[in-house]
Amino acid sequence: LVAGAIASDDIQQYISDALNLHPYYESTKALLAEYRQRAAVEGGGYPAVPAGPTLRKGMQSPRVAQLRKRLQASGQLDDQAVDNPQLFDAKLERAVTQFQREAEIGVDGAVGAGTLAALNVSLQSRIDQIRVNLERARWILRDLQASDDFVIVNIADFTAMLYRDREQVWETRAQVGRTYRKSPIFTADMKYIVFNPTWTVPPGILKRDILPKLKADAVGYTTKQNIKLVDNKTGKEVDPSSIDWAAASPRNFPYQVVQRPGPDNALGQAKFIFPNPHYVLLHDTNHREHFDDKVRTFSSGCIRIDYPMEFARRVLDDPDWNDAAIQGVLDTGQTKTVYLNEPLPVFILYWTVDPLTADGVPRFLPDVYDRDGKIFTALDAPFRFVPPDDAPAWIEGQGSP
């Protein structure tokens, strides 16, 4: 790479072409340049809109004139002169609606407390947010460059996306971990899909959620939830009434808790396995009602996806596994494992800026896990060189070479 760059007439272009940077990185980098230019034009920030009652179409107020200036500065409203700048007219309402969509807040065309807060997010804060996500993109560029086909789950956007030949071909809604049980950020290879899956309760969920319910009413709970207990040593099913539940504890519990296949299974009718130390997987769910919520932080860390059977068909990418074939397996009620022809990389990411929208208007997503701040602090921290453990003493200032 270095030799080729030196021989090239355009080193920067050569390196960019060689790296084949992901469109997200390039688009985010361009967005950063655009917002820095805006800051220069606007003297460092957008005009503020003062606090006050909710502004709606038909109202007149000096605050409306300030709202106009704010939306003109960020591009949702043109700067065409109007007879009465203090009148909240239909055109201004459309501009507010556009801003609300871009800011990922409730769309009603009125400027209440939530919209006012979003309007008064400083331009510098948006620049900082872009910088944070540009840094995140750098972390995974090498892995993305090594793959033509992959899945990206953006936790902050509650979406799962399938890429073929580095082009997004499909997207669906996702539910992610609660704010106190955050979905982790990592990469792993999807190996297989299980239809009509069982659910073996992970240790953390067993300790926090399931074991207390078993201790309270083991027979009733296992019956209601279609759960069986399996002895770790023998692999045989154990009658819950035969267990001394008073003595049971997370450290003294020699059983697996397994939920049988069925419509009430926590994993729904399909799970997508990419082995990892976090016990995280993609799966269907028996709580589909939450997909209509805007903020979808409902799981214990795994990723629940909408339209899982379409996802399975697209992931398998095999004419033998069409919709009818998948439905036929589901109808049997029997657990079936289907291996992918090739491992499919899965990237569980956390990006709070989306520059790759269909209309070209970037989206700034809420930092639901409160993760942006730590990265921004690190980016602005003074540079500090940490030598490796086996570095010569002179590198650490303890002598001379």
Identify the role of each PLM range.
Residues 1-401:
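Well-ordered beta-sheet/strand-loop patches within structured domains
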